[in-house]
Amino acid sequence: MKRRNFIKQLGGASALAMVGGLTLPSFTEQQKRHITILHTNDTHSQIEPFKPNHNRNPNKGGVARRATLIEQIRSENKNTLLLDAGDIFQGTPYFNYFGGELEFKLMSMLKYDVATIGNHDFDNSIEGLYKQLPNAKFDFVSANYDFKNTVLDTHVKPYKIMVKDGIKIGIFGLGIELEGLVSKKMYKETAYLDPIEVTQEITNQLKNEENCDLIICLSHLGYNYKRDAKKISDLNLAKNTKNIDLIIGGHTHT
């Protein structure tokens, strides 16, 4: 299938021992590896396709269509990663009624590998998110949310390491500051850590201690904030850190 068509509907990136213009130093020209990276973000409980008369996304989306695309691309390359950058919850009656159970079960059926947490994933409270974790047969990563005084302690890791076609891949997550965006009673004692400082520490660990060939950030910081230059975004993150090969972003629906 045409990758461009997939990207328009789902979002994805392919790598042939090269991601974001950075050649992986671990592999020579004779040792090229091929991985495919598929990703979603801000799906907001959109289980069904948008209606044909929808003003922005007529007859697009839906889990069934996503499943078909993913299956087709996996058949072309078994070394495929499937990632999500947060805001899985909220937006349709499916979430209002099932509280996230359906979203996690369907993502598990699609065999997602890793996801990070968005602000709307707290919409049914941190306890509500925790309650649904058994339905998620994939891992959650968040390096700058400290959950040690919450029910999510030990259930969300800062990063996950995977190996695809001999490429060692470190995947870590970052979330937006919740204060002022989400009611305190929803995220309880979740502590927000500076994404820049956390990233410098995590990427150094992944690169120099874990010896990862490729480092991916699942970010729910938002792409850019022109009206608030001090607010940390994906662009700020890229400019002020090193060792990230690929940022997969969410939140601003960019």
Regions found by a protein language model. Give the residues of each.
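Acidic, metal/ion-coordinating pockets
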Residues: R3, I7-T254
